[in-house]
């Protein structure tokens, strides 16, 4: 099936193992023209030596003439070519076991040699690439030990071999030493903490590189296999809302209990949501929306999942148990499996891409801008953030989970705005009862009349008491001025006209606050009598609004 070893490849084969028996398979013809890099020779030699290569079979001499392989050198030459080794050994004493333990790339080369096919992978030198006869299959004890070494990677299929260990009993030892495995585990942990490659990789993943390592042919395949897993672990680390599994209905006026969550959801959708066709309001007990209506029915259906804990949108990938209440959240999660990153940074010259828009916004605000437009509006807090999610997290953790709700729906009156009509009379009456008449005198002639609470009366000496203010005829509550009135004030219409005339030509010294108060009481009482329907069938003409008080007096 295979041709004998060619003269070009024979020195390398003699270096790696004893001369093969007659009929043994050798290297493929396609490898005769390959030139392997020198940096992988120590790794390959160390991997052979660590698995029981007989030291006596090594040839310290050079390669044969015409060989195109970069064959291993002697002790002196090997020390010069060992560019990637960090071993402090001298040229005269080279220990391959030390090379295995101290070489920064020995573990990576071993992984590549296991997962490489017969045609080679990514330009790395593997055992099965050089000669299929040298390919070997690890016994179960070795596979288990190697799985412990590289437990962070998914299980890899074993490489195909053309020759079992039983055909070469003196070539490989059955199992490696346990001390070597433990030492390699320690090296792996130290390298993960100190190696720039390992430290740089999570940073690049968090920034969202547009090209995943799995699709790039120049990167290590081990990193490509870890890329998708890192995305999943990154998503798993995100804080999620508490898992709710509700089976009782707390709708207003309903206290039914069910066995499963599905029955509760079916009950709410059919009896509570679809039963109300005109308004879409959540009547769940202690709901933070405080019965504010939704614009559409489907919004109420999605909102109710916050109370019931329903998550109908489940991940379809095998082995993933993620589920979401909103469809857009599921779509974002699926991108962690597929590697899709449709949101590209809008900054010129930046090729970063992200799986969701919020991560892109965070990147643009943090990397390309120093602006922090999202400000905490809690009184006394001056925190500013680049993205809304960080602001929400700050409000929830520092000011409490209900801080944004209480601030958004608080019922305090904004300064500068008038009080509602229903609350104005009581507040004004209380102020009158507590402060007394002296409080009215402090206002320098300012009266609180209906619909004119915030407008002071003009000075009696400089202007007539009649003004172009809106007439109180359209108001049904005529006692909102804050002054207690009786049914009969004891005055007549002639007194009203006389008082009005006096008010026009009198001075502040003659009338004072009591005179102005009496004038307003008489005017309001007379206007109330005018609004009553006449028993004699007299129909008064309708007065358009707004109308001047002078016109009211003249027309009557």
Curated annotation (Swiss-Prot):
Its main location: cytoplasm. A zinc finger (C2H2-type) spans 247-272, 280-307, 313-337, 343-368, 374-399. Gene3D superfamilies: Classic Zinc Finger. Residues 295-303, 357-362, 387-393 are annotated as: Interaction with DNA. It is found in: Cytoplasm; Nucleus. Pfam families: zf-C2H2, zf-C2H2_15. The keyword DNA-binding applies. InterPro entries: GLI-like, Znf-C2H2_ZIC1-5/GLI1-3-like, Znf_C2H2_sf, Znf_C2H2_type. Keywords: Activator, Cytoplasm, Developmental protein, Differentiation, DNA-binding, Metal-binding, Nucleus, Proto-oncogene, Repeat, Transcription, Transcription regulation, Zinc, Zinc-finger. Residues 57-83, 133-178, 200-222, 387-492 are annotated as: Disordered. GO terms for biological process: cell differentiation; positive regulation of DNA-templated transcription; positive regulation of gene expression; positive regulation of transcription by RNA polymerase II; regulation of transcription by RNA polymerase II; smoothened signaling pathway. Residues 135-148, 454-472 have a biased composition (Low complexity). GO terms for cellular component: cytoplasm; nucleus. GO terms for molecular function: chromatin binding; DNA-binding transcription factor activity, RNA polymerase II-specific; RNA polymerase II cis-regulatory region sequence-specific DNA binding; sequence-specific DNA binding; zinc ion binding. PANTHER family: TRANSCRIPTIONAL ACTIVATOR CUBITUS INTERRUPTUS, ZINC FINGER PROTEIN GLI1. Acts as a transcriptional activator. Binds to the DNA consensus sequence 5'-GACCACCCA-3'. May regulate the transcription of specific genes during normal development. May play a role in craniofacial development and digital development, as well as development of the central nervous system and gastrointestinal tract. Mediates SHH signaling. Plays a role in cell proliferation and differentiation via its role in SHH signaling. Belongs to the GLI C2H2-type zinc-finger protein family. This is Zinc finger protein GLI1.
């Amino acid at each position: 099936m295979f041709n004998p070893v060619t003269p070009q490849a024979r020195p390398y084969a003699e270096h790696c193992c004893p001369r093969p028996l007659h009929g043994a398979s050798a290297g493929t013809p396609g490898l005769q023209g390959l030139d392997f890099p020198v940096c992988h020779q120590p790794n390959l030699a160390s991997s052979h030596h660590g698995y029981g290569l007989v030291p006596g079979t090594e040839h310290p001499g050079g390669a044969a003439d015409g060989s195109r392989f970069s064959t291993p050198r002697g002790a002196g030459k090997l020390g010069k070519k060992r560019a990637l080794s960090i071993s402090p050994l001298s040229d005269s004493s080279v220990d391959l076991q030390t090379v295995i333990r101290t070489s920064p790339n020995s573990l990576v080369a071993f992984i590549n040699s296991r997962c490489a096919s017969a045609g080679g992978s990514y330009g790395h030198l593997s055992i099965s690439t050089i000669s299929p006869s040298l390919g070997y299959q690890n016994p179960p004890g070795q596979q288990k030990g190697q799985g412990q070494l590289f437990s962070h990677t998914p299980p890899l299929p074993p490489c195909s071999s053309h020759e079992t260990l039983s055909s070469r009993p003196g070539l490989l030892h059955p199992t490696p030493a346990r001390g070597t495995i433990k030492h390699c585990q320690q090296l792996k942990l130290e390298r993960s903490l100190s190696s720039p490659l390992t430290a740089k990789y999570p940073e690049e993943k968090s920034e969202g590189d547009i090209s995943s390592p799995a699709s790039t042919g120049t990167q290590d395949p081990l990193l490509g296999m870890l890329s998708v897993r890192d995305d999943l672990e990154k998503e798993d680390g995100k804080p999620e809302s508490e898992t709710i599994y509700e089976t009782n209905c707390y709708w207003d006026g309903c206290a039914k209990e069910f066995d499963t969550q599905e029955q509760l959801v079916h009950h709410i959708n059919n009896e509570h949501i679809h039963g109300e066709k005109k308004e879409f309001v959540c009547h769940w007990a202690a709901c933070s929306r405080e019965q504010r209506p939704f614009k559409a029915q489907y919004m109420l259906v999605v909102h109710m999942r916050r109370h019931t804990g329903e998550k109908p949108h489940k991940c379809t990938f095998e082995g993933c148990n993620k589920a979401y209440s909103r469809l857009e959240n599921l779509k974002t999660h699926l991108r962690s499996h597929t590697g899709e990153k449709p949101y590209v940074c809008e900054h010129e010259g930046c090729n970063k891409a992200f799986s969701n828009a919020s991560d892109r916004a965070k990147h643009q605000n943090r990397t390309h801008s120093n602006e922090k437009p999202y400000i905490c509006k809690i009184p006394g807090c001056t925190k500013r953030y680049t993205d809304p999610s960080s602001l929400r997290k700050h409000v929830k953790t520092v000011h409490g989970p209900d801080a944004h709700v209480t601030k958004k729906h608080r019922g305090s009156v904004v300064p500068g705005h008038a009080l509602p009509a229903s609350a104005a009379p009581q507040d004004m009456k209380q102020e009158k009862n507590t402060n007394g008449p002296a409080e009215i005198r402090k206002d320098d002639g300012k009266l609180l009349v209906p619909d004119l609470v915030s407008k002071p009366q003009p000075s009696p000496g400089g202007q007539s008491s009649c003004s172009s203010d809106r007439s109180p005829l359209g108001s049904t509550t005529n006692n909102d001025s804050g002054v207690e009135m009786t049914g009969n004030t004891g005055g007549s219409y002639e007194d009203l006209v006389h008082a009005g005339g006096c008010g026009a030509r009198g001075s502040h010294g003659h009338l004072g606050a009591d005179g102005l108060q009496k004038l307003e009481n008489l005017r309001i009482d007379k206007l109330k009598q005018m609004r009553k329907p006449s028993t004699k069938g007299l129909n008064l003409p309708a007065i358009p609004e707004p109308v001047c008080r002078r016109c009211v007096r003249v027309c009557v």
